[in-house]
Amino acid sequence: ATAAFAENAKFDDGTILADEGSYDLVVYGDSSGAVTAAVAAKRKGLSVILINPTGFLGGMSASGLGATDFLGQRRTFGGIASEFYEGINASYGEKHVRSFEPHVGEQVFKKLIADAQVQVLFDEKLNRETGVEMDGNRIVSITTLSGKTFHGKMFIDATYVGDLMAAAGVSYTVGREPESQYGEDLAGVRRGDTRPRLHYGQGDKDHFVAEVDGYVIPGD
């Protein structure tokens, strides 16, 4: 795979900036998932570019959502997620930090990217109208609003809204699927479900307790 680098394209923190080219993996997004996917693939030896539609890394975790739904089981963290929290701990000089400031989270994400030498392009939004080239049901390349084109063997949509998937014609559902679609007894709308969950102890707070239905045909 080849990649054309922009001149002097490197942040002070070591983040490598990139330009158009062909890659094993093209990751589109700015979320924590975008960072971890790009880092994991790069560590596996793939050529990777992270196309970031905004000017910062880390999505909500670097934008104010610095509290973690952590229930006391340290073993639930592993892999790059564990490395992220190790970086948070090191930043504060403490152990077991689970709430952090946005700028600290962003710096840890940047370090993960820089250490893995992942190439990043900031402020490049997908052209959702004509920017996805397909070969059958496979994405061949994507083009941004600025006109830059990126070819890849694989693509990952790591946005929160699924812009790349939608532009590629991937089917999707808005809201919850009915229980019958995939045979999931916990799918669909839940009403008055009070089955105990040990980590809450007061019933299932993830389910609706009022009769809320998001479909035109109730119960669909």
Kindly give the residue locations of the regions a language model identified.
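Aromatic-residue-lined binding/catalytic grooves and analogous aromatic/hydrophobic interfacial grooves
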Residues: A9, G14-T15, G45, D69-D220
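N-terminal export signals
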Residues: A1-A6
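Glycine-rich FAD pyrophosphate-binding loop
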Residues: K42-A62
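Active-site-proximal beta-strand/loop segments in catalytic clefts of secreted hydrolases
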Residues: Y28-S31, I51-T54, L65, D123-K125, ...
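Beta1/beta-strand and adjacent pyrophosphate-binding region of the FAD-binding site
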Residues: L17-S31
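N-terminal Rossmann-fold NAD(P) dinucleotide-binding loop
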Residues: A34
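Generic hydrophobic/aromatic pocket-lining and core-packing "Φ" positions
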Residues: A37-A38
